[in-house]
Structures are given as structure tokens and as C-alpha cells.
Amino acid sequence: MTCPHCAAALTARERTGQVCAHCERPFALDPKSHGRGMNDLRIRRIAAAATDDGRLKVTVTQLWYLTRTYSGAWGPTPAHGIRPFVRWLLALPLALPLFLWSAFSDGLWATLTGAAALAVVGTAALAKRRTPGRSGGSLITPAESRFRQLMDDRWRSTYGRLPPGVVDDGPRAPAVRESPVGRPAAVILCTDHAVAVFLRVNGIPARLRARLVEAEPAAAHEALVDVPGRLPVVVLHDASALGALLAPLLRLAHPDRVVLDAGLPVTAVRNRRGAVHRVSAAPPVDADGLRAVAGLSDEDAAWLSDGYWSPLAAVPPSRLESVVTAAVKRALTARPGALGAADGFLTWPAGEPTPAGTTSRTKGAPAG
């Protein structure tokens, strides 16, 4: 690896204990110890790009998604094969009479019945063994807990703070002070904590004269109780089943209110190369309901009903900023009931198709 201080190419022996043997200065990460792609220069480079060279601040969660070296997701697989009990329950009643017939017969009949009995037993013994079903899952390398540990322990102990422009959004992090908004003109309803911290720390709601409301999708209706009904609502959510249903259900509950869906659309990530795909452990949502309520295509509804989802926090920060800005401006000029299911998706990029029938796998920024 390359020393982040003197740029010397270091062998394993020249970087023992995360200290450069040439300049004798410590560094935080070593790919050999902390995993592929985990080195100071790469983390700094990705953080600089994410913050637009210092113009924006980003969260540790956003940096984690951007610095991942691998992500993959797989759907559930049904059980297949025959249970041993069933195999022998069928085979023994057939094989036993044949063995008896062979034992008490002579000549050709004994040979044929004996061979048939052996064939039945052999088929039962060699039949495909039952493989239990497997639930879907996903994998991101490094894991979020591991990445946070590296940032909190190794990086802070080496440099005294997180990379420039990166803020902690963990559960123990202090709350971010939000710039005051005198008379808000709109509401931004955000269901992702990392994205809400990103918006607050960059003063985006105040700049747009919007009130930021953070809530889980299931609690979104209650979170809007204290918000004046005249204010338009811009909804930010993951590309998930609950996220896709949120804006349509809010429109039904508040027919006199502008509700603009600016969440991450499934069409932008389902077949997009490089998008992060994850699998939820929550009970599946019926595909028919997703089509009827959210107006999704058959393919998108099936993808979500299989448990797949994609996090809003994985969207590049500059793209996220531009989408939120455009969505609030659009909501301010819209009329109640005039927005359809596709409105709010106009600023999101279309997905780049991937070969059908393959496991969802994406790689993060180059690990070099």
C-alpha cells in the first residue's frame, strides 16, 4: 500500500502497527488488517468526492455505502428434494415383496425379482437428498458495524476526528442543530435517519424554507399531525415496499394536501448497475397491493414483494441534494390531487439494465 503521508510504497514489513517505516508517521487503515479497499488514501478520495470538495457534509452511513467494496443480494430459495422418510416409506413396501419373491423363486424369476428389488433400494438410497429452503439475504463488505468501528476507533485515534466533511449519524452521536425556519412553505418528510442528518447538517431545509420531519414509514401519519395542513409535503423514502406505499396512502388520508413522492423509485435501482440491493427481514408485502395502491409495474412490485429494497442513503449526496431541491420547488407550485404516481421521479436517473436471472451484485468505488 501507499503511505498517506510520504507516498512511499510500503511492503507488509514496512507498515507494521500502522506506522510508516519511511516517515515514521502513523496511519489509520491497512488493507491487510482491515479488509480490501480500506486504506486512508481511498477513504479520503471518496470523502472528498462525496462532499464535493468540502461544499457538502455527509454522514458516516453515506460514506459507508460509497466506500463499500462489494454488495450482493439474493432472494429466497424453496426447499427441494425428497425427505428420507418419504423415500424409504415408498421404497420398502415395493422392495420387500420383491426380495421375498426372489428368495423363494428359481432361475430367471429369482434373478429378475432380485435385480428389481436392488434397483428400488438403490434408487431410494441415491435419490436427491432434501435441501431445506433458504431465506433471502444480502451482504455488504465491509459490514456497517465494522466500518463504523474503523472510523470511530482507528480513524479518530489516528487523526483526532473523522475525515473532513464527514459527520457521525450513529445512535450515540449528538443531535445536529437545525437552522431555524421562520415561516415554512413546505414539509420534507424523511424516513431515513442518515438522510435526515445529511439534510440538517447542510441546512437544506432552511434554504428551501421547509420544515423537516423525520419518521419511520409506519409512523409517518402521526408525525404530520402537528404540521399545518396547508403546507405541501415532499416524501423521501427508500426504494422499498413501505416506501412505495407511503405517498399514495398519505394522499388518501389528506386529499386536500399536496403530497409529492420524491423517494427513491424502484425503477431507478432494480436493474441499475452499481445500485445497492438489500433484502428485508420484514414480512413480505403483497405484489397485488403494490400494483393497485402504488401503481407499480409487475416487475417492480414482484421485486419488492420478494423483500428486495435499496437505501436512499446510498444515493450520491450531490444527486440527493439536487433531487430534494427540485422536488420542493415542484411541490410549491402543485395543486392537491394533481400529482400522479410518477411525479417526483422526474429527476431520478433511469436504471442501466443488468443481465436477467443473475444474483444482484454491486461493487463500490475502486479499492485501489
Mark where each language-model region is.
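Nucleic-acid enzyme cleavage-core boundary/entry regions
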Residues: M1-L231, L246-G368
